[in-house]
Amino acid sequence: MAALSPTFATSTQDSTCLQDSEFPVSSKDHSCPQNLDLFVCSGLEPHTPSVGSQESVTFQDVAVDFTEKEWPLLDSSQRKLYKDVMLENYSNLTSLGYQVGKPSLISHLEQEEEPRTEERGAHQGACADWETPSKTKWSLLMEDIFGKETPSGVTMERAGLGEKSTEYAHLFEVFGMDPHLTQPMGRHAGKRPYHRRDYGVAFKGRPHLTQHMSMYDGRKMHECHQCQKAFTTSASLTRHRRIHTGEKPYECSDCGKAFNDPSALRSHARTHLKEKPFDCSQCGNAFRTLSALKIHMRVHTGERPYKCDQCGKAYGRSCHLIAHKRTHTGERPYECHDCGKAFQHPSHLKEHVRNHTGEKPYACTQCGKAFRWKSNFNLHKKNHMVEKTYECKECGKSFGDLVSRRKHMRIHIVKKPVECRQCGKTFRNQSILKTHMNSHTGEKPYGCDLCGKAFSASSNLTAHRKIHTQERRYECAACGKVFGDYLSRRRHMSVHLVKKRVECRQCGKAFRNQSTLKTHMRSHTGEKPYECDHCGKAFSIGSNLNVHRRIHTGEKPYECLVCGKAFSDHSSLRSHVKTHRGEKLFVSSVWKRLQ
């Protein structure tokens, strides 16, 4: 909703300044300023006061009040509109330079509390003209916004409102009003009821008035030069610029943490309060504010009121929707000052900055090892815990998590109808077979644009390119082994997560499952069940037979990421990589990957 402030309403036929004779000054003493030597919304020419001295605008001039009987009649949407208007009015006064002390009403609204009865009626004694028993005060709130009285049906007389009635249609719906009411009524019979100096917003000069009026006609005159985002007020632009500059002028007095917006500081200050009076009836979690409890309840109810207009995806919190929308717009407002890299979310920038600072905020309480990323820390913690193992029923292989076992099960479930005629290997489809055939023919169709090296598989080319870009590697938090991608490291972590429960009675070695122990026992018995069809040579382990067969087929699936040379077995590749040591700084990371 646009920023709303109570303003003077003028007829389209008469937009001139109001005369003093239209405003009889009561002899009673009250706090509403009757005469201000300022520009007002009802006219653009200065007006000279005839009575009294110049007075400043107070919060009472822009406040709307409710009695104890009227407040319960408002529904939640009406109360929300009341809160938004009051907070925005107070913000407008302070941003325009008025020295306005914070009323207790504003303090309660900022704390997500309902205003107390005495605070809602605190302003009623200030202006005798506000006593209107024939209508509710929320009608006055709508008069502030639209310049008309709603329940009795007052004419829509504000200048330029006729063209914008559709723009404010949703507000009429909120208050159950008919936007086409035209019966002329007012607070004072025979006079324009809204041409009142004691009830409106006044400005020191034309620039302030122009800025204020832009909030009503939808103009956004203040544009950010960095991202071209536009705002209706300069104060909003100033707050937005802090995202780019990193300025955080609002500091917490308790812990020293700084923020770029006062509302963020207020939310943070509540974390220091020990009292959490709002309890969740379903899970027992406690919260400091009622609004926080309401947001939390969406976890249980499944309510997702914030929906994306482009893809229809819904979220339980507005901040999550704002972050999601950046995936459509491509906006990356959070920029790193060290390298210039931009991010869509502040948490992503925070994690990225650790690459420059070397900060490792996640420390293990058991062994003292520190980590830069929370994901690595969580994986490391599992090393200290006894994890349940997930074993494959088909082959007996065990995994540290259910997801890894599910991925492994595809090996047994998926049929492999395509067979290689040279080595007898089977594959799921022709494209995989075609890539495999390159290991027999020696064809290397995937060439590096930077150094000209060629590879038989596209995945090997992708891994090779990381040598040129010095792309960050994925290191195992438990043993330090380095991997070229996240999935490879995740598969490797199952080695550390799975408890070795089966022990060999002859040599004392421990293994993860019975199938691994069974293979190991052949080293003691001398059994060699795997025999080569070409030469009759036998092996105790099936993988050794597979390596041996490559001698007959000529298959060389292991390629060097540095020079592209291929080998039939992994150990030969490891020996070859040692010859590159000293040639390039990146070879050390390649060597680590082969350990």
Swiss-Prot record:
Q: In which tissues is it expressed?
A: Isoform 1 and isoform 2 are ubiquitously expressed. Isoform 3 and isoform 4 are expressed only in lymphocytes, spleen and lung.
User: Which InterPro entries does UniProt cross-reference here?
Assistant: C2H2-ZF_domain, KRAB, KRAB_dom_sf, Znf_C2H2_sf, Znf_C2H2_type
Q: Where are the zinc fingers (C2H2-type)?
A: 222-244, 250-272, 278-300, 306-328, 334-356, 362-384, 390-412, 418-440, 446-468, 474-496, 502-524, 530-552, 558-580
Query: In which domain of life is the source organism classified?
Result: Eukaryota
Boundaries of every KRAB domain copy = 57-128
Keyword terms, alphabetized: DNA-binding, Metal-binding, Nucleus, Repeat, Transcription, Transcription regulation, Zinc, Zinc-finger
GO terms (BP aspect): regulation of transcription by RNA polymerase II
Main localization of the protein described in the UniProt heading? nucleus
Annotated region Disordered: where? Answer: 109-128
One molecular function GO term is: zinc ion binding
Identify the GO cellular component terms for this protein.
nucleus
**Compartments (UniProt record):** Nucleus
Annotated SMART domains: KRAB, ZnF_C2H2
Purpose of the protein: May function as a transcription factor. May play an important role in erythroid maturation and lymphoid proliferation.
Family, per the entry? Belongs to the krueppel C2H2-type zinc-finger protein family.
Q: Which PANTHER family match?
A: FINGER PUTATIVE TRANSCRIPTION FACTOR FAMILY-RELATED (PTHR24384), ZINC FINGER PROTEIN 628 (PTHR24384:SF242)
What is the recorded name of this protein?
Zinc finger protein 317
